[in-house]
Amino acid sequence: MRIAIDIDSTLHHYWDQLDRVSQKRFGVTLPYDGQVVWEVDLLKPSQLEAAVAETHTERHILAAEPYAGAVETVRAWHEAGHFIHITSHRAGEAHAATEQWLTRIGLPYDELYCSYDKVSRCEEIGIDLLIDDSPVNLEGAIDAGLRVATILHPWNRDICETEDVLCAADWTGLAAALEPVLA
């Protein structure tokens, strides 16, 4: 199977980084449990763009720690012969640091793609399954005929309850939920 896997809030807990940058730069706390929609409305669009850009600098990328079980699960899938496409809504300038991070954490992959056209890229390269936290990407992938899965977050809880999305609280649960799909 051809699997695409997002990075931020999928392979690692991104929200803490975004919150720290928001507090430092703008004095605005971004409570994780209160983020029940995809849009971050506590920041102005220009502030959010600046905060996200800062979290995608080399220093922040390399400081990220993967979720427990994420690397081991992806490694097992890769060793079982599944194609692993790592995809992130990051500017092209973040590619080298992202590649360095993936190497540092020991996550094997076949392709890394940093861009803002995630679902169309998945369609272009024949991805079967997208693992992502964004309800926008999950809906787009469903509409494109892909299977979808996610790590459960406050902002994607609704899509987990209303759409055909495999949802799990953590990577151990996600691996178990996807086992029959990947068999």
Regions found by a protein language model. Give the residues of each.
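Active-site neighborhood of HAD-like aspartate-dependent phosphohydrolases
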Residues: 1-50
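Short, acidic loop-to-helix structural element flanking the phosphoryl-transfer center
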Residues: 56-86, 91-97
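Conserved phosphate-coordination/catalytic loops
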Residues: 61-68, 116, 168, 172
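Hydrophobic anchor at the start of a short beta-strand
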Residues: 83-84, 109, 148
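Substrate-recognition "cap/lid" segment bordering the active-site pocket of phosphatases
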Residues: 89-142
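Asp-based, Mg2+/Mn2+-dependent phosphohydrolase catalytic module
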Residues: 119, 123-124, 135-183
